[in-house]
Amino acid sequence: MAYKPQFYPGNTLIAENRRKHMNPEVELKKLRDIPDDEIVKILGHRNPGESYKTVHPPLEEMDFEEDPIKDIVEPIQGAKEGVRVRYIQFADSMYNAPAQPYDRARTYMWRFRGIDTGTLSGRQVIEMRELDLEKISKNFLIDTEFFDPATCGIRGATVHGHSLRLDENGLMFDGLQRYIYDEKTGHVLYVKDQVGRPLDEPVDVGEPLPHDYLAKITTIYRKDNIGMREDKEALEVVQIIHEARTKGGFGLEVFKKDLKKRLGEE
C-alpha cells in the first residue's frame, strides 16, 4: 500500500500554509528575481565569477571500493563535482513571517536532498554543497513567498531580533544592520553579507510584503491572527506527542498496560 504523506495536521489557514511549504509538489508563488551574482554576494562564501572550491575529485574520477549506496542514491550535482559544503541561515520574525525555524526544518527535509539543517529558537541554518546551495537559495529560499525582505533576515551570525517589535518601516531588528530600508524606492537593501561584512554595492531584495498578505501566508499561530487553540486537530496531535514523549521519558514500562489493552489482553 502506497503511503500518502499528510505533512501536517490541522484545518486552519496556518496548517494549510505549513502543508504547502512542506509538499514538494506545491510550487510557491515567485515574488522577485534576484540576480545570481547578488545571491552570491549576500552568501559571502565566494566572489561572483569565482570557481567553486572543491574538497575531493569528481566522483567519477574516484576509485571507490564496492559500495552499494553509490548505486542506489543519485548524488546531487555539487557532490558529483566535489564542491565544498557551505550554508545560509535565516532569522524569522515572530510577527507573521512566512516561515519559522521548525517549519523551515520540515520544509528543507521534504524538498531538498543532500542537506543538513539545525533548528534554534530564532534561526535556522541549512548546509549543502555550495553549488546546489546557491540554486535553492535563489529559486526557493529568497525569490518566492517563502521569504519576506522585512520579516526574514539572512544572518549567518548575530541573529538576534526575531522576538523584538518591528521598526517604523516594518523591518525586523538586526544588530549588525545588514539591510536597510530605502525610503526613495520602498525596497530593502542588503549593505552587508550574511555575516556582516560590508558589500561594495547594495543588493536590492525588493519591497516588504504588506501586513495583511503576511497574515494570509504565515505559518505562525498567533492570538491576534489565527491562534493554535482554533485548530482542534493540530492541538490534539501536539497533545498526543507531548504525552507520549513525557511518559516515554520514564521508560516503556509505563506503556505496558496501554499496550496490553490495545492487544486485547485485558
From Swiss-Prot:
Molecular functions (GO terms): coenzyme-B sulfoethylthiotransferase activity
Cofactor: binding details: Binds 2 coenzyme F430 non-covalently per MCR complex. Coenzyme F430 is a yellow nickel porphinoid. Methyl-coenzyme-M reductase is activated when the enzyme-bound coenzyme F430 is reduced to the Ni(I) oxidation state.
SUPFAM superfamilies attached to this UniProt entry: Methyl-coenzyme M reductase subunits (SSF55088)
UniProt cofactor(s): coenzyme F430
InterPro entries named among the record's database cross-references: Me_CoM_Rdtase_Fd-like_fold, Me_CoM_Rdtase_gsu, Me_CoM_Rdtase_gsu_sf
Record has Nucleus as a keyword: no
Pathway(s) this gene product operates in, as recorded in its UniProt entry: One-carbon metabolism; methyl-coenzyme M reduction; methane from methyl-coenzyme M: step 1/1
Swiss-Prot/TrEMBL catalytic activity: coenzyme B + methyl-coenzyme M = methane + coenzyme M-coenzyme B heterodisulfide
Domain of life: Archaea
Pfam family, one: MCR_gamma
Enzyme class: transferase
Binding site for coenzyme M: R123
UniProt entry tagged with the keyword Electron transport: no
Function statement: Component of the methyl-coenzyme M reductase (MCR) I that catalyzes the reductive cleavage of methyl-coenzyme M (CoM-S-CH3 or 2-(methylthio)ethanesulfonate) using coenzyme B (CoB or 7-mercaptoheptanoylthreonine phosphate) as reductant which results in the production of methane and the mixed heterodisulfide of CoB and CoM (CoM-S-S-CoB). This is the final step in methanogenesis.
Family the entry assigns: Belongs to the methyl-coenzyme M reductase gamma subunit family.
Protein name in UniProt: Methyl-coenzyme M reductase II subunit gamma
The organism of origin for this protein: Methanocaldococcus jannaschii (strain ATCC 43067 / DSM 2661 / JAL-1 / JCM 10045 / NBRC 100440) (Methanococcus jannaschii)
Lineage start: Archaea, Methanobacteriati, Methanobacteriota, Methanomada group, Methanococci
